[in-house]
Amino acid sequence: YRLTYYTPDYQVAETDILAAFRMTPQPGVPAEECGAAVAAESSTGTWTTVWTDGLTQLDKYKGRCYDLEPVPGESNQYIAYVAYPIDLFEEGSVTNLLTSIVGNVFGFKALRSLRLEDLRIPPAYAKTFWGPPHGIQVERDKLNKYGRPLLGCTIKPKLGLSAKYYGRAVYECLRGGLDFTKDDENVNSQAFMRWRDRFLFCAEAIYKAQSETGEVKGHYLNATGGTVEEMYKRANYAAQIGVPIIMHDYITGGFTANTSLSMFCRDNGLLLHIHRAMHAVIDRQRNHGIHFRVLAKTLRMSGGDHLHSGTVVGKLEGEREVTLGFVDLMRDPYIEKDRSRGIYFTQDWCGMGGVMPVASGGIHVWHMPALTEIFGDDACLQFGGGTLGHPWGNAPGAVANRVASEACVQARNEGRDLSREGGDVIREACKWSPEL
């Protein structure tokens, strides 16, 4: 492999798709051979020379390992940079992109472990994707909500409630001041609550809360189904009853289904909330798998208006920088290379719409100053127990979330430092809100 696929003097073309792999070779295997093997197995190579190689231009189509750098602090680990010609990939297909780059190479014997850290999608390829159904700005226009983060709540217990009680919990949260409520990722259409019943009771809750508050409200109705046809049926029903947003589990549902659903949402004026169920199976190991920033990039190409991104709060400082790196990749039009934040390549999205990051998981009102400072306005803060765990009930919990959020936004706009004064801001707001 090394003679053909390791080319350290290669000049990267503007149209090349670039990948950064963290690889650990088996003992005794040279890093150059491993890097070349990764490039070969994820492009034109096979384990032996075949006579049909002479019938094509390998130089035009092969992937090339053009750089290797040792990972600081690790004894036998390298970042291998691989360039793929754009002609290897079908236009507008995330499925084909991932099948080619990570489909086959991860079981390779010469490697102890392999992790895809980042991808550079060139403008020529990015332009073949539709991207999010609507994007952040259109979502704000639809909701008529500006200048603050959006607030949401996942209804708990996630399994076991009847549709009627589920709808009641939705109404109480929306009535209290939240913008959205959410189906949990594993709420589909089980015996205790069929999807059509849930859709109807949630729609009733949305309309009732809207008429009482004068604000646009929504509930992420999970349209994920066992078949694509079933998914379309649920999405179509949601559009018919007039709700503003639906939801999809994009990793378990698959990229092909997600791209199709995204197109449907664009055509029918629905926002699309994306849940990342199963992501940790792929991205949790430090040395093997795919980093979440790659999954976030591919979701932006496939299509989704919201994507769960983790919370940052309470995590380690370095992890905070990395999380903010892929949050920027989700919502900014142009991102500079910055290795301190885990961004290996400069990424230009060519005007593709942004995905709103959703911070969820164990957050409550005391986290609000930090969340407001870290994520800014273009984010959705998704509570669960932080709303429903209020001792007075769901609606007071929602009021507490909304008051805390607006207090933090006002304090920030007045020039106060939320990282230092956040606790004081919340305590001052408590004087005006018994719920908080």
Swiss-Prot record:
The record marks 315 as: Transition state stabilizer. HAMAP family: RuBisCO_L_type1. The basic functional RuBisCO is composed of a large chain homodimer in a 'head-to-tail' conformation. In form I RuBisCO this homodimer is arranged in a barrel-like tetramer with the small subunits forming a tetrameric 'cap' on each end of the 'barrel'. The gene is rbcL. Mg(2+) binds at residues 182, 184-185. This is Ribulose bisphosphate carboxylase large chain. Substrate binds at residues 104, 154, 158, 276, 308, 360. GO terms for molecular function: magnesium ion binding; monooxygenase activity; ribulose-bisphosphate carboxylase activity. Binds 1 Mg(2+) ion per subunit. The lineage of its organism: Eukaryota, Discoba, Euglenozoa, Euglenida, Spirocuta. It catalyses: 2 (2R)-3-phosphoglycerate + 2 H(+) = D-ribulose 1,5-bisphosphate + CO2 + H2O; D-ribulose 1,5-bisphosphate + O2 = 2-phosphoglycolate + (2R)-3-phosphoglycerate + 2 H(+). The keyword Chloroplast applies. Its main location: plastid. The active site is at 156 (proton acceptor), 275 (proton acceptor). The modification N6-carboxylysine is found at residue 182. Pfam families: RuBisCO_large, RuBisCO_large_N. Belongs to the RuBisCO large chain family. Type I subfamily. One of its GO terms (biological process) is photorespiration. The keyword Flavoprotein does not apply. Its cofactor is Mg(2+). Heterohexadecamer of 8 large chains and 8 small chains. InterPro entries: RuBisCO, RuBisCo_large_chain_AS, RuBisCO_lsu_C, RuBisCO_lsu_C_sf, RuBisCO_lsu_fd_N, RuBisCO_lsu_N_sf, RuBisCO_lsuI.
